[in-house]
């Protein structure tokens, strides 16, 4: 789009004529309203044409796909658009209030909405976010420039104005970063040539290969509703358009924005918006936690206000996108276009996603400024630093909720296989045909599971199969958290729960608060290293009573607020025993304050006026007996509404979780921890793995029964010969003994056998043992008697065979007892 290009007929170039007051005679009947162009330094008037097979025809909205020819800076471009099916879920909900303050719930039929995304033909890495509800309105991002387009007011010929986003006047916005840092960054940008958008996109895709999904909820305050003429439909369409713009920006980081709900405060604001931005942000996230999150599940909520805060465009918590208590931000939507406002919301939502300001860092985005620049310059590009910050969030498990692909009942109802969202009627969606080549579970052409697959995605899906029940899918992160397990029949992990707020932790020195045990020492160690600890109370009182950037209890309007003595422990964190200087990727300001023999260490991160200071004492920290810090005040811990009697409700074998259900210790079964079991709760999923239990039992049987039997069999086989010989030796020995007993028992011998064995030649069948003779049996056992003289010598026996006596042997002599 060179400046020397010739303008075609029908396209009027208007540059700087507004400043000279000459625009009236030039534009004639086509003159736009002054209010429509008062914020522009330059613009063109064009007439887009819709393309069909016949090349051109009159505009006809609400098509699924459409192409237009537009002209900008003398050059004709063809843009191709496709309805953004991922933008709105089937159960998109709008909350409003009647005059009595009663909540009204509406599910508008918006399946055939008119919000599109697309690209410019022939322009690499271009992107478009447009609506054609009442003409073309939206953003076009080309290689090196971004353009806005909107219908020309009161035109009957489909005329539009198109302008560079750099030509939009912007109100200077206050930021906490000093001008010196901004000038230093500007000088650095001028010296170094930034990389091309192609290089940046390639780098980001390498860093963020997995698509994340932010389920966004938007709340519009009463003043902004009044500003829109109290037209609920107009507010709704404007916020849907805003979400479409956000989606076109975040898609560069492989992040998709899904608008899941909208609430319009039609009958009055439901929070106090008096005070500074920090006060309003605190009020909003408290209202969100108490009322909104119970009505509609979402990852982040953004409040849209008409009221300004002295030049501060918005404010949000950093890295809290999945938090129940802090995943929110506030955004000022005053006299600016929705295109410009989109960059503000993208900036504040970026803080929720863990992104810090780019100021003072070596960041590039292919443009003069980036979305996360503290000046809220209206940029459409995220920087390399933002991609790195978001990567850190995901690596630290801070964005687990973003991995939840919208379920079929939460996806846009019009089926569109290939958009990587599981729409109604689909079982999976692997994306483009090329992407589906790498998916082993999903049929890309039908978005159905393959015949052997049970699932295709989710924390509890592996190798196209459900992980067995009891498989850990979300681990315990602190002593105030509880783990979650797969249930064996779903690819999704159980919803994240934690121990109920107010439960004692750290040996009763602190309370659980939103899944973390909040106490001073732990916060000091996070900032100043493992040796640091909380400073004495006198440090808190002395420093926080000053009411400056290093010691305060928040803001009162645009000024720091001094801490009352009773609230000093809930202001700026004060530590001692500091031996390490923190390294955060940014340069914080550290201050030492001597106090009664010690040094009080405090820190100011200088993140800007739109970011809460992480150097303040964490909410939920115990500041006294039965008290906690809340909104920079030391209040009674009863505000946590802890009502769990673990002895009665959980029978002393568990704790209550954030859903007020018992989470049982190992060995006890939910729901009341009264009977034996495997622990867990009705919310956590089964804590034991049935397959693992069967495997365990099988291993026990194998090692304690089968293995010993096998060892015995091997031993017997090896020693078989020795055992066999031992067996027969014992058998033979038993036989000999039996025979000897039979010979000694006359009642069992035949009559031909003599009753006394001759000492000269014993029978052959009777074994001869050395120095042993057969002892005759008598009717009554007598003590052994010995003769008074030795027996006669035995005669020698010749070797002439066995001798047979001529007459029977004489009967044995009878001996009387020895006297």
UniProtKB/Swiss-Prot annotation:
Domain (EGF-like): residue spans on this chain: 644-698
Disordered: annotated segments: 734-763, 780-819
Cofactor: Zn(2+)
Glycosylation sites: 125, 144, 154, 231, 381, 487
Segments in the Extracellular topological domain: 29-697
Cysteines engaged in disulfide bonds, as pairs: 322-401, 363-385, 365-370, 473-493, 644-656, 650-662, 664-673
Tissues/organs with expression: Widely expressed. Expressed in chondrocytes. Isoform 2 is highly expressed in liver and heart.
GO-annotated biological processes: amyloid precursor protein catabolic process; cell adhesion; cell adhesion mediated by integrin; cell migration; cell-cell adhesion mediated by integrin; cell-matrix adhesion; cellular response to lipopolysaccharide; integrin-mediated signaling pathway
Alphabetical list of SMART domains matching this protein: ACR, DISIN
Keyword Phosphoprotein attached: yes
Entry's transmembrane regions: 698-718
Biased composition (Polar residues): 735-750
Protease as UniProt keyword: yes
Cytoplasmic topological intervals: 719-819
Domain Peptidase M12B: 212-406
UniProt xrefs under PROSITE patterns: ADAM_MEPRO (PS50215), DISINTEGRIN_1 (PS00427), DISINTEGRIN_2 (PS50214), EGF_2 (PS01186), EGF_3 (PS50026), ZINC_PROTEASE (PS00142)
Pfam annotation, one family: Reprolysin
Free-text cofactor note: Binds 1 zinc ion per subunit.
Cellular component aspect of the GO annotation: cell surface; external side of plasma membrane; extracellular exosome; extracellular space; focal adhesion; plasma membrane
Enzyme Commission no: 3.4.24.-
InterPro entries: ADAM_Cys-rich (IPR006586), Disintegrin_CS (IPR018358), Disintegrin_dom (IPR001762), Disintegrin_dom_sf (IPR036436), EGF-like_dom (IPR000742), MetalloPept_cat_dom_sf (IPR024079), Peptidase_M12B (IPR001590), Peptidase_M12B_N (IPR002870)
Illness the protein is tied to: Cone-rod dystrophy 9: An inherited retinal dystrophy characterized by retinal pigment deposits visible on fundus examination, predominantly in the macular region, and initial loss of cone photoreceptors followed by rod degeneration. This leads to decreased visual acuity and sensitivity in the central visual field, followed by loss of peripheral vision. Severe loss of vision occurs earlier than in retinitis pigmentosa, due to cone photoreceptors degenerating at a higher rate than rod photoreceptors.
Summary of the function given for this chain in its UniProt record: Metalloprotease that cleaves and releases a number of molecules with important roles in tumorigenesis and angiogenesis, such as TEK, KDR, EPHB4, CD40, VCAM1 and CDH5. May mediate cell-cell, cell-matrix interactions and regulate the motility of cells via interactions with integrins.
Name the record gives this protein: Disintegrin and metalloproteinase domain-containing protein 9
Originating organism: Homo sapiens
Upper classification of the organism: Eukaryota, Metazoa, Chordata, Craniata, Vertebrata
Gene: ADAM9
């Amino acid at each position: 789009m060179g400046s020397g290009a010739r303008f075609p007929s029908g396209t009027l170039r208007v540059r700087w004529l507004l400043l000279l007051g000459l625009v009236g005679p030039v534009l004639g009947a086509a003159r736009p309203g002054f209010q429509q162009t008062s914020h522009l330094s330059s613009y063109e008037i064009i007439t887009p044409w819709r393309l069909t097979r016949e090349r051109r025809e009159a505009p006809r909205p609400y098509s699924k796909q459409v192409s237009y020819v537009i002209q900008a800076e003398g050059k004709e471009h063809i843009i191709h658009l496709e309805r953004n099916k991922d933008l709105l879920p089937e159960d998109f909900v709008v909350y409003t209030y009647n005059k009595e303050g009663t909540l009204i719930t509406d599910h508008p039929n918006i399946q055939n909405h008119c919000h599109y995304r697309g690209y410019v033909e022939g322009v690499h890495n271009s992107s478009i976010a447009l609506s054609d509800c009442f003409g073309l309105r939206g953003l076009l991002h080309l290689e090196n420039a971004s353009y806005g387009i909107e219908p020309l007011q009161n035109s009957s010929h489909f005329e539009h104005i198109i302008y560079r986003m750099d030509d939009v006047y912007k109100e200077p916005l206050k930021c906490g970063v000093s001008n010196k840092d901004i000038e230093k960054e500007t000088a650095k940008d001028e010296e170094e040539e930034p990389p091309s958008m192609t290089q940046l996109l390639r780098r980001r895709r390498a860093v963020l290969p997995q698509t994340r999904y932010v389920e966004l909820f938007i709340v519009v305050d009463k003043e902004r509703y009044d500003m829109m003429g109290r037209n609920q439909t107009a507010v709704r369409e404007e916020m849907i358009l805003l979400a479409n713009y956000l989606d076109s920006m975040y898609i560069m980081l492989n992040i998709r924005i899904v608008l899941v709900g909208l609430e319009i405060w039609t009958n009055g604001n439901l929070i106090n918006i008096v005070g500074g931005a920090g006060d309003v942000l605190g009020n909003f996230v408290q209202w969100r936690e108490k009322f909104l999150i119970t009505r509609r599940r979402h990852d982040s909520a953004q409040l849209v206000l008409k009221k300004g805060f002295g030049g501060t465009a918005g404010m949000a918590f950093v890295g809290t996108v999945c938090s129940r208590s802090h995943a929110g931000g506030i955004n000022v939507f005053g006299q600016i276009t929705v295109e410009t406002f989109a960059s503000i919301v993208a900036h504040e939502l970026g803080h929720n996603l863990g992104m810090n300001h780019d100021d003072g860092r070596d960041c590039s985005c292919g443009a003069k400024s980036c979305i996360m620049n503290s000046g809220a310059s209206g940029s459409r590009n995220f920087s390399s630093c933002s991609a790195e910050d978001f990567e850190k969030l995901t690596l630290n498990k801070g964005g687990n909720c973003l991995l939840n692909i919208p379920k079929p009942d939460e996806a846009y109802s019009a089926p569109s296989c290939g958009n990587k969202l599981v729409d109604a009627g689909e079982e999976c969606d692997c994306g483009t045909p090329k992407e589906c080549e790498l998916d082993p579970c999903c049929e890309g052409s039908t978005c159905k599971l393959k015949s052997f697959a049970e699932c295709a995605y989710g924390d509890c899906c592996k190798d196209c199969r459900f992980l067995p029940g009891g498989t850990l899918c979300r681990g315990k992160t602190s002593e105030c958290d509880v783990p979650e397990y797969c249930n064996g029949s779903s690819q999704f992990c159980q919803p994240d729960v934690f121990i109920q707020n107010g439960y004692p932790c750290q040996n009763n020195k602190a309370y659980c608060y939103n899944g973390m045990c909040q106490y001073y020492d732990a916060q000091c160690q996070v900032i100043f290293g493992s040796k640091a600890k909380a400073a004495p109370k006198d440090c808190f009182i002395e420093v926080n009573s000053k009411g400056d950037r290093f010691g305060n209890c928040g803001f009162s309007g645009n000024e720091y607020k001094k801490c009352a003595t009773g609230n000093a422990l809930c202001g700026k964190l004060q530590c001692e025993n500091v031996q390490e200087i923190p390294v955060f990727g940014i340069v914080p300001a550290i201050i030492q304050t001597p106090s009664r023999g010690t040094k009080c260490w405090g820190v100011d991160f200088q993140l800007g006026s739109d970011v809460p200071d992480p150097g303040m004492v964490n909410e939920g920290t115990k500041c006294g007996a039965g008290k906690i810090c809340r909104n920079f005040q030391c209040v009674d811990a009863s505000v946590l509404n802890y009502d769990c009697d673990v002895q009665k409700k959980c029978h002393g074998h568990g704790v209550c979780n954030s859903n007020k259900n018992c989470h049982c210790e190992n060995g006890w079964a939910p729901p009341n921890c009264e009977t034996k079991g495997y622990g867990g709760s009705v919310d956590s999923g089964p804590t034991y793995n049935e397959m693992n239990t069967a495997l365990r039992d099988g291993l026990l049987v194998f090692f304690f029964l089968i293995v010993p039997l096998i060892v015995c069999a091997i031993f017997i086989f090896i020693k078989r010969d020795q055992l066999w010989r031992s067996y027969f030796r014992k058998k033979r020995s038993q036989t000999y003994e039996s025979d000897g007993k039979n010979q000694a028992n006359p009642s069992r011998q035949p009559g031909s056998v003599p009753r006394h064995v001759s000492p000269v030649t014993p029978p052959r069948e009777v074994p001869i043992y050395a120095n042993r003779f057969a002892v005759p049996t008598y009717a009554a056992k007598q003590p052994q008697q010995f003769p008074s003289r030795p027996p006669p010598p035995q005669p020698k026996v010749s070797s002439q065979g066995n001798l047979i006596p001529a007459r029977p042997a004489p009967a044995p002599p009878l001996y009387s007892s020895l006297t």
